[in-house]
C-alpha cells in the first residue's frame, strides 16, 4: 500500500491511497466466505459453496466490490497510522479506482480534519496560586450551624413571612387564563431561590391565608420557558429552631461526648476538604492557563458536527440563538480537549489496567448497569479507546502538575504529591507489573466525533466504531 498526504488547511488534509490487488487477497477470501453463507446453491451446503461457483452465480465483480468495502476501513486506518496523522472526526472518502476481476489497484482519497500543530508553554515556567488551607473559627461555626440545621425543628408563627422563614404554599399557574399547573401543601424556604423566579419577593410580607400574584417563566413541564401568571397562597409560616450547641447536641449528632471534640473533628474535616480543593483548583487553573497561553486554529467541521448533534438531541435544530450558545460551548470544549491531547503526548501519559478497570466500574455504577455487561458492551462497540483517551487526558494534568510550581495565597509552596503521584510511585506500579494500556488519542478523537456524523453509510465504513463519551 502506498499513501500520500496533501495539506489542504492547517486542520485538514487529503490522503491519497493506492492498494495493490495482491493486498486484497485476505479481503477477497473473506468475501467468498461471507457470500457462501448467504447464497443458496443446489448441491452445496451453506458456507460450502466454492469460489468458482460463486463467480458463476453471483459474479466476480460483486465479490471484488464486497472485498473493497470490507478492506477500505483498514487501509484507511493503516494510512493514517503510517502518516502519523492525529485525525479528528470522520473522513470524506471517495473511491477513485476499483480493480477489475483479476488485477488493478484500489485507489481512494480521504479528506479528514486533523489536530493542529501547536506548542504548549514550558511547564517548569508556570506558577499556579490556590487558596490557603487555614481553618478559621468562623469556618467551624458555619459547619456546626449546618449540622444543627439538620436537627432543627419547624415551629409555626403568627406573623408575616421573612427571608429565611419556611412557608407552606399553594400555587396555581395560568397562561392566557388557562390553568397549566397547580401544586398544594409545598414547604419552601424563602430565599432559597430553587423554585420560580420572583417567588421569594412575592412571599416576603405575606401572612397565613394571604395571596400574591406575579409573572414568571415556567421551570418545567410541557410549557417550560413560557411566561405564566402565578398565584401563590401562604397557608402557614414557620421558623426553624436549632438545638443548642452543647455536649448534649454533640452526643446526639456525632460519636463524640463533648462539643469540643465535635468541633475538633469538624475542623479536621474542613481542613481535609480545603486540601482536596487545592488539588482541584490546581488542576483547573493549569488547564485554564494552558488554554490561554496557546493560540491555534480549530477544525470547523468538528465543531459544526458537535453543534448539530447537541441541537438534534434537544430537538432545537431551528433555534438560532441557542445554536450560537452551543457553538461557544463546543468551541471551548474542543480547544480544551486538544490542549489535553497535546499535553498527554508531551508528558507521555500511561493508563494502566487498574485505572481503566476502576473507571469502567465507576461508569457502570453511575449508569446503574451490571459492570460485566457494561464492560462487555463497551469492548464490543469499540468504546474502550475513547475511555482510555479520556483517562489519559485527565491524568495528563496530574502528571504535568509535578513540573509546575503551586503556591497558596500566602505564597507558601503546596505539596500535591498525595493527589498527583510522583515518578517514584509510577516506578513502583511498573515494578509491581501493573500493565499499561495503549493510549491512541487520534483513534479516540475519531471515535468521539463519529456520533456527530451526517455522512452516507458508504463513507461510515472508513471510520472506527462509534464511541460514547464518558
Curated annotation (Swiss-Prot):
Record's signal peptide: none
Stretch list, region Disordered: 424-470
Acidic residues bias locations: 424-438, 445-470
Assigned keywords, A-Z: Cell cycle, Cell division, Chaperone, Cytoplasm, Isomerase, Rotamase
Pfam families: FKBP_C, Trigger_C, Trigger_N
Major subcellular site: cytoplasm
Enzyme class of the recorded protein, top EC level: isomerase
Keyword Cell cycle found: yes
Cellular component GO terms, alphabetical: cytoplasm
Job description of the protein: Involved in protein export. Acts as a chaperone by maintaining the newly synthesized protein in an open conformation. Functions as a peptidyl-prolyl cis-trans isomerase.
Family as reported in the entry's similarity comment: Belongs to the FKBP-type PPIase family. Tig subfamily.
HAMAP family: Trigger_factor_Tig
UniProt remark on domains: Consists of 3 domains; the N-terminus binds the ribosome, the middle domain has PPIase activity, while the C-terminus has intrinsic chaperone activity on its own.
Name of the protein this chain belongs to: Trigger factor
Organism per entry: Beutenbergia cavernae (strain ATCC BAA-8 / DSM 12333 / CCUG 43141 / JCM 11478 / NBRC 16432 / NCIMB 13614 / HKI 0122)
Amino acid at each position: 500500500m502506498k499513501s500520500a498526504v496533501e495539506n489542504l488547511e492547517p486542520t485538514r488534509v487529503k490522503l491519497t491511497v493506492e492498494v495493490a490487488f495482491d493486498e486484497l487477497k485476505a479481503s477477497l477470501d473473506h468475501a467468498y466466505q461471507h457470500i457462501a453463507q448467504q447464497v443458496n446453491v443446489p448441491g452445496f451446503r451453506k458456507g460450502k459453496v466454492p469460489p468458482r461457483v460463486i463467480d458463476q452465480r453471483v459474479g466476480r465483480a460483486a465479490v471484488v466490490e464486497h472485498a473493497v468495502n470490507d478492506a477500505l476501513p483498514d487501509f484507511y486506518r493503516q494510512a493514517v497510522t503510517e502518516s502519523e496523522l492525529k485525525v479528528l472526526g470522520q473522513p470524506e472518502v471517495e473511491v477513485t479506482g476499483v480493480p477489475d476481476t483479476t488485477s488493478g489497484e484500489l485507489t481512494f482519497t480521504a479528506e479528514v480534519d486533523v489536530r493542529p500543530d501547536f506548542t504548549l508553554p514550558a511547564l517548569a515556567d508556570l506558577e499556579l496560586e490556590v487558596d490557603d488551607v487555614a481553618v478559621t473559627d468562623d469556618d467551624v461555626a458555619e459547619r456546626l450551624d449546618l449540622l444543627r440545621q439538620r436537627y432543627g425543628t419547624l415551629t409555626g408563627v403568627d406573623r408575616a413571612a421573612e427571608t429565611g422563614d419556611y412557608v407552606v404554599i399553594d400555587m396555581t399557574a395560568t397562561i392566557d387564563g388557562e390553568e397549566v399547573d397547580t401544586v398544594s401543601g409545598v414547604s419552601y424556604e424563602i430565599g432559597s431561590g430553587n423554585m420560580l423566579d420572583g417567588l421569594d419577593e412575592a412571599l416576603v410580607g405575606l401572612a397565613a391565608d394571604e395571596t400574591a400574584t406575579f409573572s414568571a417563566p415556567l421551570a418545567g413541564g410541557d410549557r417550560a420557558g413560557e411566561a405564566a401568571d402565578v398565584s401563590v397562597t401562604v397557608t402557614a409560616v414557620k421558623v426553624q429552631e436549632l438545638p443548642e450547641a452543647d455536649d448534649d447536641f454533640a452526643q446526639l449528632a456525632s460519636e463524640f461526648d463533648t462539643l469540643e471534640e465535635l468541633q475538633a473533628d469538624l475542623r479536621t474535616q474542613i481542613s481535609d476538604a480545603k486540601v482536596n480543593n487545592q488539588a482541584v483548583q490546581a488542576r483547573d487553573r493549569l488547564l485554564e492557563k494552558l488554554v490561554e497561553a496557546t493560540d491555534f486554529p480549530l477544525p470547523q467541521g468538528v465543531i459544526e458536527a458537535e453543534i448539530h448533534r447537541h441541537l438534534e438531541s434537544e430537538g432545537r435544530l431551528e433555534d438560532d440563538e441557542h445554536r450560537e450558545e452551543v457553538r461557544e460551548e463546543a468551541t471551548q470544549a474542543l480547544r480544551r480537549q486538544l490542549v489535553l491531547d497535546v499535553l498527554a503526548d508531551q508528558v507521555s501519559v500511561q493508563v494502566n489496567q487498574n485505572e481503566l478497570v476502576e473507571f469502567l466500574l465507576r461508569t457502570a455504577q453511575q449508569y446503574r448497569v451490571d459492570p460485566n455487561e457494561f464492560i462487555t458492551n463497551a469492548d464490543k462497540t469499540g468504546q474502550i479507546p475513547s475511555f482510555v483517551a479520556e483517562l489519559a487526558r485527565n491524568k495528563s494534568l496530574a502528571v504535568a502538575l509535578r513540573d509546575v510550581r503551586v503556591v497558596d495565597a500566602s505564597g507558601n509552596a503546596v505539596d500535591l504529591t498525595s493527589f498527583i503521584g510522583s515518578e517514584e510511585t509510577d516506578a513502583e506500579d511498573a515494578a509491581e507489573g501493573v500493565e499499561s494500556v495503549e493510549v491512541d488519542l487520534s483513534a479516540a478523537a475519531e471515535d468521539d466525533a463519529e456520533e456527530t456524523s451526517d455522512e452516507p453509510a458508504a463513507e461510515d465504513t472508513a471510520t472506527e466504531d462509534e464511541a460514547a463519551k464518558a
